[in-house]
Each structure stands twice: as structure tokens, then as C-alpha cells.
A protein has these predicted regions:
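Short, Lys/Arg-rich, polar N-terminal cytosolic tail immediately upstream
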Residues: 1-9
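Short, Lys/Arg-rich cytosolic juxtamembrane segment immediately N-terminal
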Residues: 8-18, 152-160
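Juxtamembrane "helix exit" motif at the C-terminal ends of alpha-helical transmembrane segments
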Residues: 25-43, 169-190
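Cytosolic-facing loops and C-terminal tails of multi-pass membrane proteins
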Residues: 33, 188, 198-226, 235-336
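Transmembrane alpha-helices and immediately adjacent membrane-cytoplasm interface residues
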Residues: 45-70, 91, 95, 99, ...
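Peri-catalytic and regulatory segments of divalent metal-dependent proteins
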Residues: 60-161, 165, 262-265
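Post-HEXXH active-site segment of zinc metalloproteases
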Residues: 156-187, 247-257
């Protein structure tokens, strides 16, 4: 049975929160094992301490601004006179989302892509490439802007930044514990009695296992959360535009665009609506921050009650003053 729009949105939110909670649990488990190895009677201090550390890191991430990201991308602030259609579309979607109008930035790049950033929903920023403005029609541009507006409304930027930094603590703690064991021996200092010593050894073994597995699982969970937030932004965009086909067509055009991104940077690649220069492999589904585009398109078209193959229709004529549409072509399927 197909999910309704609200059901899909709620499902994606639940999934992302569950996955994020598992990362916090992994962090707490690793902290417990480390403390239990050296102070078995105070293992609970490791649990509380590691989770408190994660909270502090998350709060620090909350105060990081978007200026560095915009600088890396080479974005410039747009004006209404220079990009009237983009300005109008952003304003429309801000009204639909019930948010203040975000600042608009343009990236001088012939490829098609876009991202959102900002500390909180009322301080949002949307950046798009010049290639996107030239190659998408108004419906498709509206779908892309709605997707980025949804990231702002859903507080995804702050959520994912905090999550990434919290997840990043896990390999740091794991590496620290392995080094401590390497120099101090299995189980560290023994307790005053045999029971404490045995418990310390158990914690040490568990800690070593977690040191190997926890960083891998944390990374996979982080990537899974990112994919869920992309699905959530797609569904929320459909809610804002009431026209899922616009975003679906835009996603396919962006994916099929042969122009490489000149301003490509690995530090910001996960922020874009479609990951630039994404390499496909057997493990692409697990190691990708974004869902497969065909899966996103199918989900969008199911919301519209349409067949996923039907959306690549000719682009209708645009009114005077709108973005000039590219020549009408039949879009081929995306090849693996």
C-alpha cells in the first residue's frame, strides 16, 4: 500500500531519529567500556561522560555559521534585479513553508546543483549554480528550491552537523582506547580484588570489539540518517509545491548533466541536492549520503499517483520573463 505524503514525512522523521539515537547509544557503550576497563565500579561515569561530551559537541556545532561553506563553494549573494525568477521562487516557497525568506546565493558553475545552509530556520541560506538557473524550467527550479527550503524548515543543517560531529567522536575514542590498551596491556590496572579484575577484563574485551566495529557502524548510521533526511526533504518539497513532478524532473536532469562541477570540494559535497561526481559501486547504497536518484524519483511520483516513467514529458512553454527552457528532448534512463 502506498504511503500518503504525511505518512512518508512522519516515517522518515522517525527513521532518522531512531538512527541518530543508535549513534548516541554507540558513543555511550564505547564510553562505558573504556571507563569499565580502568574503573569497573564506575562504569556508569563513562556512560554519562561520553553522552555529555556528545551533547557539548552538538551544542558547539549549533553555533557554527554558514560563511565557511559559502566561501568554499565560491558563492556570491544574489540580488533581485540580477536573478528575478530565482528571487520570486524563493519568496513563494518561503511563504509556503511559513519561514522568513532565506538569503540567496549563486555559484558561478555550469553544472546543475544547489544546497542550503544556515544556523537555524530563520537564518537560512539557499545557494544554486548558474547552470541550474539556465537549464531548469520554473517548475523544476521551484522543486529544487522547495527541497532546499525543506532542509531549512526541518532544521536538517544543524541536525546533520551536530550528528556528524557526535559520530566523529566515536573513532577518536576508539583510537584512544586502542592506544591505551597497546601501552597498558589488556584490562589496564587490575582492581583490588579478583572480581574487579575479571570485570575489568570483560570491559576491555568489549571495548576492543567496539573500537573496531563502532566507528564503522557509526559511519553507516550517519550515512543512513543523511539519506532519510534527503527523502524527508523530497517529500516536504512535494508538500510545498503540490507538484512532485517538478522536483522529479529536476533530479533526473541534474543527474544526467554531463558538466562536472568546477567548484567541487569533498568537504561540501554531501550538502548538495545531488552529490557531485558520485561514484557508483556495489556498496554505493551503503556508502552514499544520498539515496539513489531513481529511488527518489519513484518515491516522488508515487506521491503524485503517477508512473515513474511518465515524468520525462516535453517541457511546456514558459511565460515571458521566466527562465528560458532548454530544447525539448526525451530524457534517457540513468545508467549504472
Amino acid at each position: 500500500m502506498k504511503k500518503t505524503l504525511q505518512e512518508q514525512i512522519q516515517s522518515n522523521r522517525r527513521a532518522s531519529l531512531i538512527l541518530a539515537s543508535l549513534i548516541v547509544v554507540l558513543l555511550g557503550a564505547l564510553g562505558t567500556a573504556i571507563t569499565g576497563t580502568y574503573a569497573p565500579d564506575y562504569w556508569w561515569a563513562g556512560t554519562l561522560g561520553s553522552m555529555a561530551l556528545g551533547l557539548i559537541v552538538g551544542l558547539v556545532a549549533n553555533f557554527s555559521g554558514p560563511s565557511i561553506v559559502l566561501s568554499i563553494a565560491g558563492a556570491r549573494e544574489a540580488t533581485h534585479a540580477q536573478d528575478q525568477v530565482l528571487d520570486n521562487v524563493v519568496e513563494e516557497m518561503a511563504i509556503a513553508a511559513g519561514l522568513p525568506k532565506p538569503k540567496i546565493y549563486v555559484i558561478q558553475d555550469d553544472t546543475m546543483n544547489a544546497f542550503a545552509t544556515g544556523r537555524r530556520p530563520n537564518e537560512g541560506v539557499i545557494a544554486v549554480t548558474t547552470g541550474l538557473l539556465r537549464k531548469l524550467d520554473r517548475d523544476e527550479l521551484q522543486g529544487v528550491v522547495a527541497h532546499e527550503m525543506s532542509h531549512i524548515r526541518n532544521d536538517d543543517i544543524r541536525f546533520m552537523t551536530s550528528l556528524a560531529l557526535t559520530a566523529g567522536l566515536i573513532p577518536l575514542l576508539a583510537d584512544m582506547f586502542v592506544r591505551m590498551q597497546w601501552w597498558g596491556g589488556l584490562g589496564g590496572r587490575r582492581g583490588r580484588d579478583r572480581n574487579s579484575g575479571d570485570l575489568s577484563t570483560i570491559f576491555a574485551v568489549v571495548g576492543l570489539l567496539l573500537s573496531v566495529l563502532a566507528p564503522l557502524f557509526a559511519r553507516l548510521l550517519e550515512l543512513a540518517v543523511s539519506r532519510e533526511r534527503e527523502y524527508l526533504a523530497d517529500a516536504s518539497a512535494a508538500e510545498l509545491t503540490r507538484y512532485p513532478e517538478g522536483l522529479a524532473r529536476a533530479l533526473r536532469k541534474i543527474t544526467l548533466d554531463p558538466v562536472p562541477m568546477q567548484s567541487f570540494n569533498r568537504a561540501t559535497q554531501t550538502m548538495y541536492i545531488v552529490k557531485p561526481r558520485a561514484l557508483k559501486s556495489r556498496w554505493a547504497g551503503l556508502s552514499s549520503t544520498h539515496p539513489e536518484v531513481e529511488e527518489r524519483i519513484a518515491a516522488l511520483m508515487s506521491l503524485a499517483g503517477s508512473d515513474p516513467e511518465r515524468f520525462s514529458r516535453p517541457v511546456p512553454p514558459m511565460p515571458t520573463g521566466a527562465i528560458e527552457a532548454p530544447p525539448v528532448v526525451e530524457l534517457p534512463p540513468i545508467l549504472d
